[in-house]
Structure formats: C-alpha cells, structure tokens
Amino acid sequence: MNDLNLRVAALKVCAHPKRFAELRDALVPLPNTWIAAPHDFVLQFAAAKSSAEQVQVVKDVFYGEQAQDHEDVAHFLADLLLASPLKHAVRNQLTKLFSDNALAKQNASPHRRHSKEHLLEALQQSLGEMANSLAVITPPVSHERTNDVFVSANACLQNFPFGREALGKQVHRFAPLLTTALERYWADICDPTLELSPTRRNELYLYVQNALRFLVSLLAEWSDKLRLFEDQRFPGTSNAVAQKVARYYDTPWDVRSIAALLIGHLARFSGTFKAYVEDCSRPKAEQDVPIQMAALLVLRPVDYTENATLALAILKRIVAVSELKSTVTNLLVFLSKHLFIYSKSLGEMHAHLPDDQKLLYQRILAQLQVFALQNISSDTDSVRHMSSALLHQVLQHAQAAGQEELFQVVYRQFEDRAAYLNASCMALEQLVAVAGVSKSIENCPSLFGVIFPRHLGCEDCVDALFKAMMVSAHKTEPFAEWQSRWFGLLLAAIRVPEKRRQVIEELIAQAVQLEPTRLAQVLLPDDRLPLSCKLAAILGVRQLSARRQNLLRGMKEEVEQALIGLDDHTRLLALRFLVETPRPSELLNADQMGAIELYVRHNANNPSAHLRQLGYGLLQKALKRVHFGLVEYRKSRTPASQEVLQFLIRLIRTLAQNLFPTANYGRRWLSLRLLRDCLELSEMVGITFSELGIELPTEALMACLGDSYEHNKVLAAQLLERFQSHSLFKPDEMIELLLSLRPSDSATGAFQLQVYCKASRVQSEMPTPTHGGTIHEPLTFRALQWCLQHLREGLRLAQLDLGEAAKLNPLYGLLFASRHLLQQLKLKELAKEPQWRQYIDELVTMCLAVSSVVLPVVSSASPEGHLPETCDQETDQPLTNVLDRQLSREELLQVRTTPQMILLCAWRSSKEVCLILGELVQRAPLEEEEDEEQQQQQGDFLLSRAQLEAIGEHFLQLLAETKHRGAFEQAYVGFTMLCRRFWHSESVRLNQLPGQWVDEAMAMVSGQEEWAGKGARLCATRRSAGMPFMLQALVGTELKLGTHATLYRCMNRLLEVCERRTGGAAGITARSHALNIMRALFRSSELAELVTEFMARGIQCALDGLLLAEEWAERNSATLLLAALIVRVFGVERARLETGELHVRNRMTGRIFFTRYPQLFDYFHAALQRESEQMDAGGGGSENASGKRRQAVQLEAMLLMLSRLYPSSLEGAESTLNLSEFVPFLIRICHSHDLMTREMAALVVANFVTQEQALAEIRRIVVELKALQLRLKNTEAANTKLNTNVLHGQLLLLLHLHRLVRWTRPSLTRMQLHTLAELAAPLLQHDACAFSALVAVMVAAMEDAVEPGLLDFQLLEQIGVVYLLNHKEVQSRCQQLGISNRFYQIFGLHLHRLRGISQGIVLHIVEDLAETIWALDELKVELWLYILLQRSLSEQNSLVSEQDIEHFEFSRDIRRYFETLSREQREEVGQELYESPAVRSSVLHMMHMIKSSKNSCWSLQLAGRLAALQTLLRDPGLELNQLVQRCSEEHSTHQEAGLLLGLRRLIGESKMLERKHWLPMLNYAQRLVHPGQPVYLRHQAAELCDSLARNHLRDQLVAGTTDVDIGLVGRFSGLVLLLLHDDAEWVRHRAVQLVCGAGLRTRSGAGQEQEQSAMAPLILPSALIPPFLDTMIGKLTFDDFNMVQRLVDIIAEPFTTADAMELFDKQENNHYCERNHVLTELWDARGRADPRARTPTIPTGYQIFK
C-alpha cells in the first residue's frame, strides 16, 4: 500500500516515482521569502545537512523558546510546510505540529506559546501569498510552478484539520486561479503549433487532473462560500473547459472522470442540476459516457425522489455501451470501478423512495447485476474483481429489500448454462457469501448432479465454489449431513485418477480443519484413499498432532512403503509426519527411528537438488529430537534415551557406508552433511567415539578430499581436522598432486595438506627443517615454506623454459595450496612473528615474479594459440590429453608441449596470484593503517606501503592488458578485495586511491590526450577485456559505504562519451570501451536498481550506436549493450510458449515500461515517425546500401524491444503514453524494404492494437486489396507495376491481425477470404513471396473455421480456385525464390477438410500428395505418421505413447490441421490410411529409394519417420528375422524409433518368440541404454524389455525353472539393472514398473502368491534392486555353484568392463549410477542365494564399509 500511495503522490506532482522517492529524502530548500532572513531559526534550518536534521530543527523551533521574533516562527513554519514536497519527512512533521495535540505538548512560557488562532493565521497568510504569486500576468507563471502550488494547497485537505480550516478562508482566491490555469493548460494541449512531445502532453494532462481534483474538492467543501464569489466567469468557464476535457478522445479516463464530476458539481452549484440529469438521460455518443457516469455518482439519496426514473435511464445507457464495447478494456475498467462506487451509495436510496417507486430501485439493481454478470469472468483482473464485488453489493441490497428475483437470475444462469462455467461459478460463489448454501443447493440441483462430480479437482472456479460452499455449510448443517454431502464427495473425487490430487488434498485438509477429530476417524481407516491425502490432512491440523504416535502405529506399513515409494510428494509428507511434532523435546520412538533409517538408506542417492534440500531440512528436525534424547541419556540412562543413542550409532554407520568410492554426488552431499551434524551433536553432548563404539570413517573421508565438488572437500576436511588426531597423508604423495597438471589433483593435494597441518600427530614428517622461532602454527609454516621452495624451483624453470615448467611444475597447484593454507590462519597473529612477516614478503615477491612470467601469455593477442620457444617443439612426440589421468614425471617428459598446456599454466597461475594478493590485502595488517608509535615499536604489519603500491599497479596492469577471460575475471576478484579494503580504510591515502584509479580509467576510456599513451594499452577487442571488470570492481565495492557517487560519476561520463559522437578512430575506440563498460555495469547484480535511472539513456546510446557506428567494433559493442539492457529490463530469457510467443515473464505492459523510462517514449516516437516518413518518401533515396542496412538494424532492434510490450488494461486510464500512439508509424513501417523489419513491425502492430482497432485495420486492408484486384483485373497483369514490399507488408499485417480477432466478425472474414482468392492468380504472376503470404492468411482463416456454417458452398468454390492454379507454375516460381511450396499443400488440406467429405480428404492426402511433381515427401510422411500415431494412441493397449509423438517433433501446421478435424473425420481418415494399399506402396517405394540412393537428398529425419510409419500400417511387410538382423547393424539414430516400434509390434503379435532372437534383441536393448543415447531411446529400451519379460521370457524367469538359459537371464538382469540406474527419472520409473509388473520382485509374507497376479507397489530402484536380484538369482534352481557364479558374472558384466568403469566412475553422462554399490548388492544377493558360497574376492573399495 505504501508503494501505491507513493505512485499516486508522484503522479499528483507529475514526477517519476523513483525520482519522487529521492525528492522525499532530499533536503527541503528554504522558501524564497526567507533566504536572506537573519533569524536564528532560519539559519539553524539552513545549516542542516540531512532531512533528519531538518526534522529535528523544525521540532526545536516549534517547541523551543525563541528569544526574539517569536511572531515570525509560525509564519516561517507555515511557509516551509507549503514549500515541502508531499510525503516528505519535514512536511509530515510540520503537519503534526500544526495540530491540537502539538499545542497541548508545549512547555514554553505562556507568552511564547503558539496558539491555534496564531497558527491558523500563519497558514492562511502563507496560502494567500501562494495564491498571489500565481496572479502575476506578465510574464505568466510556468505550468510547473502553478501545478506545485495547487498540489501543495490541495494537500491541506488530506488529514490536516488546520490546513482545511485555513484553506476554507482563502477559497475565494484559488477558484479563479484554477479556472485560469485550466484554460491555459487546455489551450496548450489543443495548440497544434506547439508540437508537444508525447511526454510533455502527458504532463499537461496530469496538471489538468490536479487542477480539476482541487476544484472538485473546493466545490464539495465550500460551495456556499463560492456562491458569494461575484466573478460569474468561474462556473461558466470551468464548465466549458470540463466539457471539452471530458469529451476529448485523447484525454486519459481518470482525467475525464474528474472533469465529468466537476460538471456535475457545477450543475448543482449553478442550480441547473435537474436539467443536467435530464440531458444525461438522453441518448448520447460514446464520448459522453464519463459525463453520464458522473451524473449517477453525484446523485444524493434525497435526489432519487425526483430523479429515480432518470437515473435508471442513464444506467441503461451505460450498460448498453458496455455491451456494445465489450472488447474495449480501459472502458470496462472505468465502468466497473465507478459502477461499484455507485452501488455502495444505493443503501440509503431505498429509504427515500416512495412506495410507488420501489420498482425503480429493483430495476436499478437489475441493471447493475446485468453488468456484473457480463464481466465477472473477464480476462482483465481489475474488471473481474470489481464485477465480483459489484455483484456481491447488489445481492446484499436485494436481500435487504427482499428482492428474491435477483437471486433467481443467478440460479437460472447456473442451471441453464447461459454463461461460461467460470462466470456461473463465480456468480454463485458471491451469492453463497450473501445468502448461504441451502437455497443454492435447492435451486441448483446440477451442483451435485453434474458440476461437482465432473469438474471438482479439474477447474479452479469449481474448486473455489466448492470450498466456499463447504465452509458456509459447516456453520448451518448437522455434522452427519455435512459429512455425507461434502466430505463424501471429496473422498469420491480423490479416487478418480484424472483429478488433480494436490487440489483435492488441500480441500480435504480444509475440511479436516473444520472437524478434526470426527473426520480423522473417517479418513484414516479408509484403505482406498492414497496415503498422501491422509498425511496432508493430519499435518495440516494441529489438533491431531498429539495423536500422531498412535496414528503412526496404525499406518506403519503404509508410511514405510511411502518412504521408499516413487511419488516425491508422498515421500516428503511421510518424512514430515515422522519428524515434525508440536513438542520438539519429544523423543523419537522405535518406529520413527526405523522409518528414518529406511528413508536415509534409500533416498540418499536422490539426484534432485530440490528434494535433497527438503529432505535434509526435515532430517535436521529429527536430529534436534535426537539431541534431546542424548541430553536425557547423559542425565539418566532411560531405555528410551538408550534407543536414541543406538539409533545415532546406526545412523552414523549408515552414513559412513554411504561414502564408498563411486558414490554419486547426491549421496555424498547428504551423507557428509548428516555425518557432520551427527558428530557435532555427540560432541556437543559430550559423548566420545569410544562411548559410541564406532570409529571415524577416515579412509572414506580421505577419499572425499578427491571429490570433484569443492564444498564436499571442505566438509570432509573439516571432519578430519576435528575428529582425527593422526594424519596418514604422506608429503611425497601430496607434492605429486600439487605438481600435477590437473587442477582437480592440485585441489585435492591442498586439502590433504590442510588436514596434515591440523593434525596433532603425523605419520610422515615434512622434508623441511623445523623453525623453532615460530610460535603460531609451526606445522603450517613448514608446509608453506616447503611449497615456497618448490615454487622457487618452478619459477626458475619457467623463466628458462615456460613450456617445460607447464609440464613438470605448472606452479598453480603450489600457489593454490599456499592460498588455501593462508585462508585457515589469522593473519593478525602472524604479523607478530618475524618469520611469518618474512614469509609473506617472500610470497608477495614470488607472486609478482610469477605474474611477470605468465603475463606475455595471457596478454597475447591470441592466448589460446600462444606457444613460446620450448625444447620439444621440433620433436615428433605424439599429442596426448594430459588431463585424462595423472601422469608421472617420466611420462610427462615424453609428452609434447601444446599451447593449451601453456595457457592452462599461465591463466591458472595468474588466477592464484591475484587471489593470494587480493586476500592478503583484504585480511592482513597494513603498514599505512598502523599508528606511528606502533610502527616504531613493533612494526606488526604484513604488507608495506611499497608492496601495496606494487600490488595495486599489478592489478591495474592485468586488468588493462590481459586478454584471456579466465585470467582477468580472477584478477577482478582479487582487485575487488583490494578495493573493498581501500574504500573502508582509515588511512586517507589508501581511501583516496580507488577514486584516483576511477579518474585515470575514465580518462583513458574517454581518450583524453594526456592519457593517450596509457589508453593504447587497453584491449580494443574481446569486449574491452578486463577494463569493464576494473570499473565494476571500483564502483561495486563503494556501495558498502552507502554512497553511490562513483557510480553516478562513471555512468554520466560514459554516457557522455557515447552521446558526444566524437569522430575519428580515437572516438570510435572510446565509444566501444564505454559501451562495453556500461554493459558490465548494467549486468552487475550488485548495482541492482541503482542503474535503473541510467537505463533509458543506455538504450538510446545502444540504438544510436547501431545506426551511427562507422566500424563493426562499435556496432558489436552497441549490440551487446542492448542485449544486456533487454535482459535487465525484461528478465532472463525463459522458454517460449508452444506457439512461439515470448514467456509472459519476459514481457511487460507499456504502462509500466514507460512509467519507468518515460523519456524512451519520445525517443521511440520520434524514431518511428522518422522511419515511417522515409518509407512514405521512398526509402531515403540518396543513402547507400550500408546506411540502409544500419538503419534497418536499428529499426529491428527497436522493434525487438517493442515486441516485448503489450497494452495494459489501464491503457489510457491515467496517462496518454499509450502504445496505440506508435501504431500509425508501425503500419507504414510494414512497407519496409527489409523482410525482417516487415515481419517484426506486423507482429508489434498486432500486439499494440485492440480488437476494435484490429477490425478497422482489417477492413482498410481488405478494401485496398480489393481495389488492387480490380486494377489488376482491368489491366494486363504483366504491365502493372506493383510495390511488392508494400503488398507483402499488408499481407503480413493482415495475418497477425486475423490471429488477434479470429472469426469474431464472420462477414468481414468471409469478405477477406473472397478478396484474397480473387487476388491470388494475378499475384502469383508478380511475386511468389507475396503469393505465399496471401495463402498463409487464407490458411490462418481456414484453420479457425472449425464451427459449421462459417463457410458456405459458394465461398468454398471461390477459395478452391486458388488450388486449381497450375501446380507446376506454383512450384517453379517458389523454387526461383527459394521458397518451400509446403504452404500451398497445407492450404489444400484445409480446403478439402472444409468441404466436409471424408473420402475426399483421404483421396487428397493419399493421391494428391503422392504426385511426383511436388516432391513433398517430408510433408506427406509427416502427415501420415502423425495421423497414424494418433490413431494408434486412441486404441486400447496402444503401441505408442505421448513420448513417441513428442520424439518426432511434428510441425505446428500438421498438429493444427489434425486438431481441426472432427472426431469422425479423424477416425475415418486414420482407418483409411491404416488400410490403404497406396500408402503402403508409397512408403515401401520411398524406403527402397532411400536404401538405394547414393546422393544425400534424403534427410535423416525423413528416413526415421518412414521407418516408424511402416510399422503403423496394417500390412507393414516386416519380418522379425529382418528386424533382428537390423538390430546388429550400424544405422542412424533417427531410425531407432521405427525399429523399436516394429520390434514391439511383432513381439506383441507373435505368440512365441524363437530362442535365437532373444539374445540379439537383449544385446540391442543394452546398446540403446548406453548413457550417451537419447533419453527417448533408453525409455524405448525399457518398453522393449517389458514386452520381452511379459510375453516371451516369462518361462525363464519364474521360480523353479530347471532348463535355464544362463546367458539369457544374465543379460536380461544386467539390462534391467542398467535401466534401474539410468540418469533419467522417467526411465528408472519405467524400469520399476517393468520389474513390479512382470512379477520379478520377491516379497516375503503371506502376500507373496498374491503379488504374482497383481501389480506390486512401485518403490524406488534402490529398494527394488535387492528383491529383484533375489528373484533372478535365488529362485532359480542350480545344482552347481559355478552356474550361480557364472550368472552373477554375466549380470555384472555391464558394470565391470573397462568402458563401464570409465563411464560410470567419472559420472559425466550418468550422475545416478553407483557402480561399486551395484556390484556390492549383486555379491550380497549371491550370498543370500547360496550361503555355502565362500566370500568372493571383490576389487579394492567395493566393500570397504560392508
């Protein structure tokens, strides 16, 4: 609400909201009459430095005892109040002081106290002086000053009693001034010679609005006083101006409404009110609606005695206009708002009407109800909400007056389906809120007969109505009846699969909240309800929390099943049910602890980050309850607390086991965090490892230090530091990692070194001498010295041969380790020891030396290809990817040095140097910040003044000269740390350095002569390289101080550089740098909204750069800046809708856009006007081709921004900055010579116009096209010259406008089709491009002609003439321009569809499209395949699914054509295609041509679609042997879908599959499930396995089979394991359905036999794998143990090969599969199958934690 008030207040003073907010915080200037005043209180106020100080001065002046000039204080404060901006703190304080409360608080002596009379006199005097200041005639006072006076005076009426009283005494001064001001404002608005810009005209309208509002307020408050005013010009002139304002079409609706109110008040003031109301009741034009609406609003209750009939007549006129203009959104917004205000005034009207006029009251309410019901489901939010409130108000009045007829109207509308379901439900919801539920149920039997059973859980409006009625009925109905009617309906709805379960669950939870105890008894025992429904109800009702323990016992099996079920929502609900409790101190019981263990065991590897975070949050709640149990255990070892301790031990062991090698990221992430929490919990309570009886999983945590994610490394290192006393790491192994070329190895070595340094005991000592003088962290000091020693060696080698150093000692690993260890230390403590100070000094020197060595590489013009001289350049050594694995020194010596190796060494070394220096400056004690006495005595600092200067210059050099992005990005990070320290430094010199650097950078960028030498060092390419980052660091770090001076200084300077347009190469370079820097600043998230005020100028600079730039570098920079600004304005690009439209989050209303950036309206308006004038003049004539292209590029960019805007529902309500202002220019721009410009302009026009404007424009275009058709008909087509650009633009515009209006005006659309059909033939002779656009318009109209009767036979015959044109000519002309003739055949498809003869449709699809002349195999095959897929999808036990249709990516025109077919046509056409011999022959012929063709004219997509199409025919001509043979052949991935469909069809049709086919098909499926294959193919492999398992392999997979094919069972089991560990969730879920549906899962208990016939519950793969393996291994009868071992080896084969180890262990293509875990499960299953088997030898790491 504060934002709304701010916006309204800002509009009152005609200021931008953000600028107005700044005005509120700015200092209030002294009034002009007090500037030279010598009074003390004036001087005190003038000396204030902030608005807060000014407020305090004002209070002191008011309450203090002034020794002199006491009489002037009140006058000064009154002048100051009226001079202060609205909502300013000073004005607010003064308003409080000029009140009775403030007078009562005075403590001054009686003769110096302020009195009410004195304050009122001061206010009255100040108001009089303000009025007199406007009475000056020559020179006239500016409009701005006049508006400020009126706004300030009008504010006296807002919660300011003293101001209201004082203004009442000066009302005679302001009335004539307001009349004069209105005349002046309106004269300027109507004067065409002034050529007002749109924004200036909008400001004048706002001034008019303020003056009108003030005048209405004066008339409403002091009409009696104004009657004493002798100037008769006041009412007459004001009324004349108000009449013009209210009727003028360009006036915003808010201004028109206030002008109309003024007319009504003036009519009452002048005594002509009766004539005024009579005049408004007569038929009027549309522009008189505001005046008629105001006539109703100014009516008083007593006026209805004489004017009730007239009021009804006026209301009827208004409702009639709303029906006629139902598509004009801003009119409906205006009417709905004011009719609702009017309805609120009708409460007292009924009492003043005589009995014979009571019927008029009912008719008035009926008219209001008509409007409300018509618009209650409007697409516009404000209209919909206002109409709902209006209906509610009307029904309340009707109930009070006993008018039952209005209720019956709502009932009849609902029952008769007279309106849309949405409108009927919303109306009935308002009725229920007024009259209750019982009558609605009685009068609307379809509620429970049709609406609720069919639409509950499917339609939002029905859900809202049901909720309102259920809650209302609970207050009146007996519980039994209420439960049976409402709750029973919800229980029935939750069982329907098509319903939205979450919505029904929310309604059930709402019902349970109403009756928690009794409904729980009904809800919980019902086994037919899903568990999620029960849990949602229990968790949503606090009263049931106390019974949660009992509920858990009753639902234990259900909850445990839910914890491992496939439904994510239910899993989280079950976990919430276990861990959440009203009393956090309540201990976990055995059931809860067991269920939590079950959840952790099977959900730890969940790859979803969202679910992982939610689950971790809930488990933390469980650990809090564990904490209370451990505290109780320490106090008194109760059985319950001992169970909690044992649970913690089991949980820690489980988490430790989860850290096995190849565990996926999700398992490691969750396990490390929970393990840390558990260990910290035990440490907090004081329970040791020995007491827990466990050991720290040292080896697992040490392995986690090699994790590819750094935060996992950090957690593992913290756990090892904290709980491990003895380090097992060896220095030789660590230094080998630090010298590795692989950055991941160096990071692992650094973390190992961190753990090594923190250990109290180490297994291997560091090979460096002990420094006895160091007290602080001696082991870390030795480690750093050790790294420094190797750094010296590496630096010496790099100085001699950088290529050899890049292989043998790449430096960055040692630098990273040094930085990492320094991060663990407190640098202030190090400054106290000389050894540490010496080390830091050496490290800084070393870093600068390393940077100087690698700088030539990263600053090279081409860092990626830079190769300095090295000793192995002339050798024939082979190239090797050295990052695949860790290589030894001997192996590295045999590797050839490559530029990539050198660049990796250079930029990562530069990165570590920058980060080390930046962190040292940020954290270390500095010499310049030490006091002089401290420097003389101790010198406790780590960085000297000289080192700081060297570091600063080093960063500036890197950011100015570096070309490699990785290097200067990290230099930016380090430089940011330095700038942050300097900005906050207490040292004056350091604090001034960033400002000096900014000035120097700005001087270099702007190309000043004295900085020309340094400016030449800047990178002119690569988006200015590091220069934008330098400015971003300097500007962004200053924000922490709370000041933005540097930002404003930089932005203004950069914008000036771009706007200055200096010529020459220096000017071009300067503008390029400025554009690139602004791009970085606009993209910076730190600056956020601070850059908003510069965005309009930035957009102008970018667009001007596109037009005026002479070099590609500047145009490129301008394009990048514009792209960044579009993202900043409209948000990050989101996925487009299926129709190709932008996401709504990437669009904005024109009202919001131009409220934020008002100056852009004038810029766009002028630019579009200029371009449109050039279109009319013939395109600029003298401009060269390059200039035309730049102009087109700028115009396209402008249209790209405008295409993201759309009209607001309040368009024209409060502003004249309407998008419709651009439409005339855009229509002319549609005639541009550039195709893209024409298309964009047509799209923008369709976005900007209303439906009425679109219809008018369509009429105009159709008339022009008809004239063109007649002209072409009367003259020879060949001799007629056409401007094809204009014609093509008109057709594009017609296409987009038709998509807006559709068939809302059938007669106009028919005329449009007739005209286009007549024009098609002559247009084909002139231009095939325009002909294609014409046919596209016809296709769009024909697509929408779904309802019968829209097109008659005669019109279809006229349209059919277009398809009778010479097809060869159409094809040849399209080929000449490179246009596909697909559009023409789509036209033919719709033409035959509209004729309504199914056989004709089939003949056209089968025969016409098969003509060789068209060569439209792509279209034909796509259409056939889509129809047959849809036919197969509608069958029972369908071969295809929605995923198959999505896979083939059918075009929109094919999908749209199929949607337009009726259901009968779809079935008939699909069946004809399915049985057609011609289709089969054509398909087989094309497939033969593809196989025999040696050229590449056949696309892979066509081949894949043909393969799928063949399988869907009645007689596909496929043989299983051929398909099985193709399974083993190499072919395109596009053909896999067809091959799989064919296999599944033949497998399903054959009763028995030959044994020779089993293994080839399993091998083929295994090839498809490779993680590198598309997800669709992997899913299809699961479908294939399901078909095999259900139909043909069942005899091999059942228990007790003796003749078992080990290879078959093993291959199938391994394949299913791969599917269960697939990376895609829907593939894993399909595999779960396969296992459970085929009976391949063993379950113990009585239900084992039952499960063979019914589908088993679907559970997570991790929980399903053990029973699956038990089925595949344990239930098969083997006499020989070696057979079991062989089966296990075959199952494990996909996970044990070298390729599998490479694939799964890296976790690149598959992030879910955990190879070691799979093998461990497999070996465990083998052990369960044959307990006699000895424990197998498993490779190292497979069973570390078993």
From Swiss-Prot:
Detected in the larval fat body, salivary glands and wing imaginal disks (at protein level). It is found in: Endoplasmic reticulum. The keyword Endoplasmic reticulum applies. It comes from the Eukaryota. One of its GO terms (molecular function) is calcium channel inhibitor activity. Keywords: Coiled coil, Endoplasmic reticulum, Phosphoprotein, tRNA processing. Together with methyltransferase Trm7-32, methylates the 2'-O-ribose of nucleotides at position 32 of the anticodon loop of substrate tRNAs. Plays a key role in energy homeostasis by regulating the balance between energy storage and heat production. Functions by negatively regulating Ca(2+) signaling pathways that are involved in heat production and maintaining correct lipid storage in the fat body. Regulates Ca(2+) signaling pathways by reducing the activity of the calcium-transporting ATPase SERCA possibly by promoting uncoupling of SERCA ATP hydrolysis from calcium pumping. This is tRNA (32-2'-O)-methyltransferase regulator THADA. It comes from Drosophila melanogaster. The gene is THADA.
